Amino acid sequence: MVDVVETLPLFPLGTVLLPGASLPLHVFEPRYRQLTIDLVTGTIPGKQFGVGAVREGWSPDDGREGLHDVGCTASLREVRRLPDGRFDLQTTGDRRFRLVDVDDSTAPYLVANVEWLPDDEGDTPTDLAPFAMAARAAHRRYCTTAWRQQGGGDGEMPADLTDEAATDVADPELAHILAGDCLLPLSDRQELLEETCPMQRLQLIRRSMTREAVLLAELRAVWAPSAKFAVEHSPN
């Protein structure tokens, strides 16, 4: 059951923000500078805004049609204003939403009406445990393969170099955290974001990381974002 519709400022990006993941932003466009100012001054309460991924072949300026339906809120953690008026932001993904409609006339930036997108209920910790174990194993294989390709040697990646951020994460949120430090295609990350079944989500991330580990090992290749979005931090 979805919640009531709420209003959220929207920041279209060429990436998918996942709950619990960190997202640094370098803000230089005037409209998003204004969004940052509105967040910092409290004009927009809660210091949160929505991040929506731009569809392949579309532009951030294409409005509602150019965005995926499901996005994630970003919580503003740190703000550094640069002398020329630009901003460096540190944000963290929080809550998933589904776009209802988008207003491009009220503010310099997009403002969206959204419905919150909760997880399905029913899976117990016991149900999820084997899927979580398999996902963690796939994540370690991916990280070990990446470590070897970067000159780390032929053995297992040392335990003290493994990202332990997900050690105490509950299984329903685990897939998002594991995906946070892997270079996965935008389509994979978007599918992961849209999936509301924790068990299916763990299976999705396991398959994605297994495939990417093979590509790393055999082709020494990883997915790279489109050049149109390859700018400092994330585009705006």
Residue ranges with predicted function:
Residues 1-236:
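N-terminal low-complexity, acidic/polar interaction/targeting segments
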